[in-house]
């Protein structure tokens, strides 16, 4: 399993208010969600009308598929009406089956007796 993450910075030079910025961001997020299997959210500097930071995540069974989807998002971001793509950061990581993730896998974490002393009567 591979997880692709991307952080976009989109400048919105004509935004005079947060409402102007939200209009541009919502339109972009809706278009991305309609066309691509990604999760997308604003991730920083929510109070500045002139720039929006968006985080995206995708899960796929091949790195090439993650890369293809993230590239499609970046292509869409390059043509955002009223926006200018200012920065892009992407990373694809392997998880499970030889990849790095939770040490010894989530199964080991779940089988640990971390909650062994929990007594339901103590609620």
Where are these regions (language model features)?
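Long, contiguous binding/interaction regions
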Residues: 2-123
């Amino acid at each position: 399993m591979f997880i692709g993450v991307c952080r976009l910075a989109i400048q919105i030079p004509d935004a005079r208010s947060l409402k102007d910025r939200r209009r541009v961001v919502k339109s972009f997020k809706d278009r991305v969600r309609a066309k691509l299997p990604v999760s997308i959210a604003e991730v920083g500097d929510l109070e500045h009308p002139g720039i929006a930071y968006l985080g995206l995540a995708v899960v796929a069974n091949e790195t090439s598929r993650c890369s293809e989807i993230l590239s499609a998002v970046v292509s869409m971001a390059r043509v955002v009406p009223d926006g200018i793509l200012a920065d892009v950061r992407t990373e694809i990581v392997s998880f499970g089956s030889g990849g790095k993730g939770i040490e010894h896998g989530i199964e080991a974490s779940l089988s640990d007796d971390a909650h062994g002393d929990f007594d339901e009567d103590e609620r």
